[in-house]
Regions:
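The feature marks the mature, well-folded catalytic cores of soluble enzymes
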Residues: 1-172
Length: 172
């Protein structure tokens, strides 16, 4: 039997960068948190806990039932987060280290610009995924679909301008 190892394995560079951001903060004084799961990997999450990071859920933050205090350190995961959460972090006066993947940020910026121009936005992705919840929160007029079948049902107005975008981690 011959086993050939793939050239590219492991985490994407966005996740690696988020892990690097956390590792660079290990020696910082004060309480350290990660907003949501840094990555969908139990070993990495446990490693970050051993290094002193605690998990804070977006829902807890938005409902003010978390234990964040002014000047605590909060790392935003590679998937990013919603507009409301960004505003809440600013309001809470915590030190934010935004480790959102550059590709996710690029999509978010494109959506924000299209939204400001009054475009309608068509977005393919898993509406329950943290990345999608985050990027779509920056638009007012957005239609989300998860499959080609759902996309075929979208009503298109030929008089409108549309931006078509997709989740970076889409597996379909």
């Amino acid at each position: 039997m011959v086993i050939i190892r793939a050239k590219h394995m492991g985490f994407c560079f966005g996740v690696l960068e988020a892990i690097n951001v956390c590792n660079s903060l290990v020696e910082e004084k004060g309480r350290k948190y990660i907003l949501g799961m840094l990555v969908h990997n139990k070993q990495v999450v446990e490693d970050m806990e051993r290094k002193g990071f605690k998990l804070v859920k977006e829902e807890e933050l938005l409902e003010d039932i978390d234990d964040l205090k002014e000047n605590d350190i909060v790392v935003v995961r590679a998937h990013g987060t919603s507009k409301n959460v960004h505003e809440k972090l600013k309001e809470r006066k915590v030190k934010v280290y935004d480790a959102t993947c550059v590709f996710v940020n690029k999509i978010r910026q494109e959506i924000e610009i299209a939204n400001e121009k009054g475009y309608s936005i068509l977005f393919m992705g898993d509406k329950n995924h943290p990345e999608v919840k985050g990027v779509i929160s920056f638009a007012d007029n957005i239609q989300i679909f998860e499959s080609l079948e759902e996309a075929m049902e979208v009503k298109i107005d030929s008089d409108k301008t549309y931006l078509l975008s997709t989740q970076t981690t889409l597996n379909k």
